[in-house]
Amino acid sequence: MDGVADLVVIALLGALTLLTAGHVLALRSRSRAVAAQAQQWADRIRADAENAARSHQDRLLAEAAAYRAELDRREQRIAAQEQRIERELRRLDAARRQLDERTAQLDQRAAELARLAEERRAVLEQAAALTAEEAKAALVADIVDQAKREAAVLVRAIERDARTNGEARARRIISLAIQRLAGEQTSESVVRAVPLPEEAMKGRIIGREGRNIRAFETVTGVDLIVDDTPGVVLLSCFHPLRRETARLTLEKLVADGRINPHRIEEAYEASRREVEQQCVRAGEDALLEVGISDMHPELVALLGQLRYRTSYGQNVLAHLVESAHLAGMMAAELGADVPLAKRCALLHDIGKALTHEVEGSHAVIGAQLARRYGECEEVAHAIEAHHNEVEARTVEAVLTQAADAISGGRPGARRASMESYVKRLQRMEEIAYAVSDGVEKVFVMQAGREIRVMVQPEAVDDVQAQVIARDIAKRVEEELTYPGQVRVTVIRESRAVETAR
């Protein structure tokens, strides 16, 4: 048994040896195949790398050749520019040398001319017995006098041309605007009459020991006049808004029949609210009539208050509406902004609603109100410039001035007191006499709309007469307030008298 086992073991070992040897041989052959394949791959990669390196080298060589050619071209251009710069520098050096030579020659000639001028001045001073300063002063005086005369002649020619062309067109535009406007004109006095249903009502208005009338005057700020005039009592106040409120208050008291201090206060409060509503409605009606749709409510209310204010007897709100129509029509004729011109003219006197409450002229106050309540700068400027307190810089501002003057200066628009009228005429005469010593007589004619000045012919020539007329007109514009325009006429008359015997 042991021998068999040994044989089996030996056989197994031999088989394993054979299998191992075969496997080793197979592995060796596979390794040789893999090595051959790897060698092929390596050869292929090496060939590809060599080809890529050669192509990259060729591309780099081509780029280097291109860069070298570009550098050569740039070097050639730089060399050409350097040559041009050198030539320009040589030319500039030559020109500088010539300029220095010319400058030296000019300096030499200037010195020579100065020497000759000094010699000539000395000769002239010796010949004329005048120093250079005295001769210069005399020459300047002659030139100034001649320039004044030439300027006066030129001004007269320009004014003549302006009158010939400008006045004709302005007259046509204003005439068209006036004839297209047909506005009503109303004026109020400081006294308002209130009718009574019966004469016995006067006693009830006065009250016991006059307590009702005192309470009425205290609450309303209006004087209540009860006299012998049958069927009416009078309300007197210079403030039109308070006067209207007092009128409504008294009418309510008379209609109710109960008149006592407590009832007076109640009626006054109701009337005050009613007047405020009337002011708003009046402002809205004015906007509707002019054709303006948007405006701050405070400005509308202030505009309505002007319904109860007058200027020289002219209702201010009616004047504003009339001015707005005139400004709009003139703007249309001139091709200007019609809505803006209407707005400027409608608001130009808005400051009069607060002149008794705020310090300052109504033009400045009105401009401040316009800016405060969102109006554009053109409107505010037209308001503050309509009385020349600020120089007018826009067409709308000038149209506002013209519309204001037309509306206030047309016949029947305003009335003035006799005292102010006489003072204005006297001031016109004083201005005319003060302008020149050559004024001999002054006549103010046509209710202050024309000033005729008689001058001394030996003291004033024709050119000076034109200057005197212009100076008088300018001072009248600056110092006086008047409706319409004032014409200044200077008359220079020469008479030669001889007697035959």
UniProtKB/Swiss-Prot annotation:
Xref: Pfam families: HD (PF01966), KH_1 (PF00013), RNase_Y_N (PF12072)
CDD domains in the record: HDc, KH-I_RNaseY
Sorted UniProt keywords: Cell membrane, Endonuclease, Hydrolase, Membrane, Nuclease, RNA-binding, Transmembrane, Transmembrane helix
Similarity field: Belongs to the RNase Y family.
HAMAP family in UniProt: RNase_Y (MF_00335)
Membrane-crossing segments per the record: 7-27
Cellular component terms per the entry's GO annotation: plasma membrane
Domain KH: 190-256
Enzyme class per UniProt: hydrolase
Chain's role: Endoribonuclease that initiates mRNA decay.
Intracellular or extracellular location(s): Cell membrane
Gene Ontology biological process terms in this record: mRNA catabolic process
EC number assigned by the record: 3.1.-.-
Domain HD, residue spans: 316-409
Protein topology in the membrane: Single-pass membrane protein
Name by which UniProt lists this protein: Ribonuclease Y
Main location: membrane
Molecular-function GO terms, alphabetical: RNA binding; RNA endonuclease activity
NCBIfam families in UniProt: HDIG (TIGR00277), RNase_Y (TIGR03319)
